[in-house]
């Protein structure tokens, strides 16, 4: 029996569409600013990130944590209201394969991936609650973080934490979001807990092929989508956040203090409900930056960790 080359190609393409490419970590968080100068001071001076151009959006600016991860800052839209989060993004080995995979799973995807001027490829979808999610295939070569001539002309102090270890966002319904993040994308349970033992406020799941995680910040507001009317910009900034990993909290805070990078109201480090040392700072528009140790210093409340913790050795 003869099988045409065309048939074999279609079969291979179909199989590829059913295979999820690796999702290896958090790529970035994109937030809005109402004051670009103040925001630059915060991310460059206080947090120590590296400013660079935004190859994806000429109106934006990137503040790099390392060569692959960054905070994307965009101008505040007129209709933003209390929202300061534009999207969250995850790194994948193949943006095109991921686009095909999600399409095969019934997720609405764009017709093609976008190609940025830095050599990265990306596309954007919406999760079941309407949050924008990007999948980014990093450039094949990344230069510039240590002053080497490369893709970006970067300046600024070294970041206080050299990896984004998690991102968090407001979530109304865990089961609805789980169908996408755990069911389709393969995110793995990591930890869950709350301010009280009998109530879950936070649900964390790691990317399937790494140790960075997404934290659901569960709201007690009405189930559905969008931002509940009773949530202020400040409260929303606490929920929609990102976290930088550090090895030693005492050393990190001491560095910030000695270099006058703590602002007028210095944050107080504390052991969180997950047993990890952490402290919170906020950008000028209220987006929370959570500095957190990689591993717990005490027993977590509510549940045990069900996956390996991130490590500093995993940093790019």
Identify the residue ranges that each predicted region occupies.
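Sec-dependent signal peptide recognition
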Residues: 1-8
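Hydrophobic h-region of N-terminal signal peptides that target proteins for export
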Residues: 8-17
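Vicinal oxygen chelate
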Residues: 18-21, 24-34, 61-63, 77-163, 168-169, 191-197, ...
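Core segments of cupin and vicinal oxygen chelate
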Residues: 21, 30-70, 116-126, 168-221, ...
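Sec-exported extracytoplasmic/periplasmic mature domains
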Residues: 34, 44-48, 94, 103-107, ...
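Short loop/beta submotifs within extracellular cysteine-rich repeat domains
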Residues: 41, 50-51, 69-72, 80-82, ...
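Flexible internal linker/loop segments at domain or repeat junctions
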Residues: 214-234
């Amino acid at each position: 029996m003869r099988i045409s080359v065309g048939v074999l190609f279609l079969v291979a393409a179909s199989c590829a569409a059913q295979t999820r490419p690796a999702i290896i970590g958090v790529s970035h968080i994109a937030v809005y600013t109402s004051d670009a100068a103040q925001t630059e001071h915060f991310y460059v001076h206080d947090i120590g990130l590296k400013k660079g151009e935004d190859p994806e959006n000429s109106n934006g600016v990137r503040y790099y944590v390392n060569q692959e991860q960054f905070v994307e800052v965009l101008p505040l839209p007129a209709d933003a209201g209390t929202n300061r989060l534009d999207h969250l993004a995850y790194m994948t080995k193949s943006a095109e394969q991921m686009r095909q995979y999600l399409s095969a799973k019934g997720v609405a995807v764009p017709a093609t991936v976008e190609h940025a001027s830095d050599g990265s490829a990306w596309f954007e979808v919406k999760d079941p609650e309407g949050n924008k999610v990007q999948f980014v295939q990093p450039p094949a070569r990344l230069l510039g973080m240590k002053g080497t001539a490369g893709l970006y002309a970067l300046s600024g102090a070294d970041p206080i934490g050299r990896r984004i270890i998690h991102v968090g966002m407001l979530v109304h319904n865990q089961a609805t979001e789980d169908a996408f993040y755990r069911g389709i994308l393969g995110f793995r349970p990591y930890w869950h807990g709350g301010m009280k033992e009998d109530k879950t406020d936070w649900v964390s799941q790691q990317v399937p092929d790494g140790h960075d995680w997404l934290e659901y910040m569960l709201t007690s507001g009405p189930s559905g989508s969008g931002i509940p009317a009773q949530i202020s910009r400040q409260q929303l900034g606490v929920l929609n956040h990102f976290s930088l990993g550090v090895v030693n909290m005492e050393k990190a805070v001491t560095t910030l203090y000695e270099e006058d990078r703590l602002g007028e109201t210095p944050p107080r480090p504390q052991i969180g409900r997950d047993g990890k040392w952490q402290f919170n700072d906020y950008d000028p528009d209220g987006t929370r930056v959570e500095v957190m140790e990689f591993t717990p210093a005490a027993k977590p409340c509510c549940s045990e960790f069900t996956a390996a913790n991130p490590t500093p050795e995993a940093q790019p």
